[in-house]
């Protein structure tokens, strides 16, 4: 068995290079899909090494494209690699890899946002949540356009222990724009601290492992790329429903340059806003003049617990959306203006 962090000596037979595959099948990155190809196998090997020991592992790769990371995963001597690719142009090149690694590579033409990976691997791979992570991994060079909605979806799956996490605390090694990678791993108080920081870190151990310069990709993106590793925590740092945590965190960070009481106030209808915001902050023991980036996970834990109690007291509170209240107010204002015009006529 290969040592942790080392690729196995298992190698694929001689194949065209990724650059040759791109020419052979006349592949071009599609701007609409935010596609950027990583051609340097030294870098794809490094991504795979950082995922851990993959010998005899079951790997789910998202968005394989022309197959650069796919090759590195297969060279790690995995038991099985499942790839899900939305763009049909890449399927022939992936089939070439499948033929070079009989029985190892399974190709699905589909959308990672809707694919049911919980049904993809054997039930025997499942482990209790409290055990070590299962021998199942998620790896992917994500298109920029899908990376944020996809990680939020998977974080919710972690919270519910479903989707890819029916197998246990499945580890993920994924690429993001460098700025997004920095936000995911940002500490309390840092300028990069954001909604993503809190949502990821209350559920996972998050590490920004290394950065890949944009020039390593074809076509070259305007930004560098960060590789991030996620290991779900045995016990989440906030034990509340995902949607409730998400709502509190979103409201706080929508006014990221203001004091935290500004965003928290938007959790409540205008008529009770001042009173309820004060009550929330007092019961959670939060300084109302802290900025959003200064709030720790412990602060958010207290806020979510108090907000949950307030929602239990008022069952309609959680459904409240201040943007909808604002929209309705604008509609009523316009109706009054129209009525006034009609009256003058």
Curated annotation (Swiss-Prot):
Q: List the record's Gene Ontology CC terms alphabetically.
A: mitochondrial nucleoid
Q: Which Gene3D superfamilies match?
A: Ribosomal RNA adenine dimethylase-like, domain 2 (1.10.8.100), Vaccinia Virus protein VP39 (3.40.50.150)
Q: What class of enzyme is it?
A: transferase
Signal peptide range equals: none
The annotated transit peptide is positioned at 1-27
Electron transport: present as a keyword of the record? no
Can you tell which superkingdom this protein's organism belongs to? Answer: Eukaryota
Q: Which GO terms describe its biological process?
A: rRNA methylation; transcription initiation at mitochondrial promoter
Its EC number(s): 2.1.1.-
PROSITE patterns per record: RRNA_A_DIMETH, SAM_RNA_A_N6_MT
Q: What is its main location?
A: mitochondrion
On assembly, the entry states: Interacts with mitochondrial RNA polymerase POLRMT. Interacts with TFAM. Bound to the maturing mtSSU until the late stages of assembly.
Tell me, what does this protein do in biology? Answer: Mitochondrial methyltransferase which uses S-adenosyl methionine to dimethylate two highly conserved adjacent adenosine residues (A1583 and A1584) within the loop of helix 45 at the 3-prime end of 12S rRNA, thereby regulating the assembly or stability of the small subunit of the mitochondrial ribosome. Also required for basal transcription of mitochondrial DNA, probably via its interaction with POLRMT and TFAM. Stimulates transcription independently of the methyltransferase activity.
What's the protein here called?
Answer: Dimethyladenosine transferase 1, mitochondrial
